Amino acid sequence: MLMSRISYRRLDGILLLDKPAGISSNSALQVARRLLRAKKGGHTGSLDPLATGLLPLCFGEATKIAGLLLDSTKAYDADVLLGTTTTTDDAEGAVLLTRPVPTLDAEMVDALIPQLIGRIRQRAPIYSALKQGGEPLYAKARRGEVVNAPVREVEVHAIELLFLATPRLQLRVTCGSGTYIRSLVRDLGEILGCGAHINALRRRWVAPFQIPKMLTLDALEQALSAGRDPDSLLLPLVEGLAGFPALELDAQRLACFRLGQRLRDHSFQTGRVAVFSRDGIPAGLGEVDSEGLLVPQRLFNL
């Protein structure tokens, strides 16, 4: 018996997925892509399999801004278990060390948290997707090799203690790109002198989607089974450009921009800009230098 092949089509937009625990970000993307029958898709930075929450998925022309969302500010809620360190810095790893948890109160923890706020140096978990010698660190760790995880500078904007009842506490973290919450929790555990690991992690938002209306994979499947138009379940690409200054071009200049030509105008705002037609259709992203030269970077075919 021959099985019918799925017919994929062009689909442009952003799905705000509520990723479930126990599945990788790429697996979640592939499930959503099959359900939507989208030809082209990409995610905007991995969430650990243990983690849940917002995973923006970009389809079609929106994949051209996936890297920009990867660099966005993000917010998380972390459930932390004190007294135990693990190989992965979360509940999925093997226990490395167990230590007694000191008597703590919120005032004591709040007094120590500022050590982890601002521009800080952070060692990545050895079980992470960071590459070393062209290979993810986790692949080396799984083979039992000694992994020297890199130390990188990251930015943590805020950490709020939401709950404390030792040996558990809950944190709300707002941070910049590249920050590992597992590393942050591990380092807090060392500051407290007892060690710690993440028991559960949820990503609340990714800029510019600070109040996201997320869909689970089950809800997505149900909506499509009920006959919903796939396009109606996605945000338009323009929603992902909200963090950039908008620059409108007239038809003549827009035609040049779409051909990849550079444009000069001292009235242009310096920095990265989202370029639009006069009728509000996004044409691409560009960079304006100090001389007012607009250099096309990503062009949209909408």
UniProtKB/Swiss-Prot annotation:
Question: Which residue positions are annotated as catalytic?
Answer: D48
Q: What class of enzyme is it?
A: isomerase
Pfam families attached here? TruB-C_2 (PF09157), TruB_C_2 (PF16198), TruB_N (PF01509)
Q: Which GO terms describe its molecular function?
A: RNA binding; tRNA pseudouridine(55) synthase activity
A biological process from GO: mRNA pseudouridine synthesis
Q: Which reaction does it catalyse?
A: uridine(55) in tRNA = pseudouridine(55) in tRNA
The source's domain of life comes to Bacteria
Task: Report whether Signal shows up as a keyword of the record.
Answer: no
| Alphabetically ordered keywords of this record | Isomerase, tRNA processing
E.C. no: 5.4.99.25
Which InterPro entries is this protein grouped with? PsdUridine_synth_cat_dom_sf, PsdUridine_synth_N, PUA-like_sf, tRNA_psdUridine_synth_TruB, tRNA_sdUridine_synth_fam1_C, TruB_C
What family does the entry list?
Belongs to the pseudouridine synthase TruB family. Type 1 subfamily.
Q: What does this protein do?
A: Responsible for synthesis of pseudouridine from uracil-55 in the psi GC loop of transfer RNAs.
Can you say what this protein is called? tRNA pseudouridine synthase B
